[in-house]
Amino acid sequence: MRQRSQSPGSAYFYYPRLVCVIGARDDEKATANFAPVTWATPLSCEPPLFGACVSPSTRTHHLVLKTGEFTLSFLGMAEASLVDTLGRLSGSQVDKVKALELVLEPGEVATTPSLAAAYARAECILVDRHQCGDQTLLVGELQRVRVAAEAYDVQGVLRLDRISPLLYLGGNRYVTTDPTSESRPESRGDR
Amino acid sequence: MRQRSQSPGSAYFYYPRLVCVIGARDDEKATANFAPVTWATPLSCEPPLFGACVSPSTRTHHLVLKTGEFTLSFLGMAEASLVDTLGRLSGSQVDKVKALELVLEPGEVATTPSLAAAYARAECILVDRHQCGDQTLLVGELQRVRVAAEAYDVQGVLRLDRISPLLYLGGNRYVTTDPTSESRPESRGDR
């Protein structure tokens, strides 16, 4: 394979990545703010922790630190345009809920809403944060997960024949999975 | 959308996720160890940081802390079986390089090799670590990124018509992207 070597930062080599939308309660403006994040990952099984990178300059960062909680909303490919818009607007300047007529779901445990359009939603309590270069890794403990009843199979695996998860590819482009490519490999050495 | 509420941990709601294989030098055994990780994320642009969750009980954890460096290898869908096997074998018990006849690429900056089969590889120096529940988030500063010359377009975006990135879906299942689904949405409110 012909290769090229390059400095870090010049390629989106770590994409595609699943998009999740972080929700934060904005008491001051009597609304909530929603921002798409792809630099995010589960961090622990026990306790169940999930981390999301947020720039300290954002309204989301300010709100999560203030309220001590956040929600995660996972959306399908059909919501690419909405997600893109959420990423372009600033919660400091615009009430995104109002401007985009977002339909919200109230929290069951937390008091921060999530997006009704999501096929999976989680409520998190902020339990820790780590400064990582120019971002803050917000560490949330998962309190409750709500999923569309038809979205997952009995093993808890996403049904790609029913849900087309939204993945970010870099450069303002989005993509989803190919359900026909799904495979359960036979490990080398399996008999 | 009919919903069900559930305790965290009972659904793979945060999948699919891009697979990356962490490489660590094993001086003691004069080999290297490779383990697939999906709980991983970029953490910062400047400096360029990448974080990967590793259980403290693993050989990878031991080796990365000892050597202070690790590599990342991103593989295509065709390597699902290899990745699955790398995840099943323990580096404490087996020399995976030997057992699986892995072809390695030496590092350019670090001295830890990566997998030659990868379409993208990165070399990281361990700069920090955070205990997150039952995992350690290893924080690496990206030193060098090497990519297959044909894998990315001029904007640095992965060419899905050429590369089928390997995504983990949970439950021992893998999937890749659908290149025909790629879109660059027009933001709501764009004129």
Residue ranges and their predicted role:
Chain A
Residues 1-191:
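Basic, polyanion-binding surface patches
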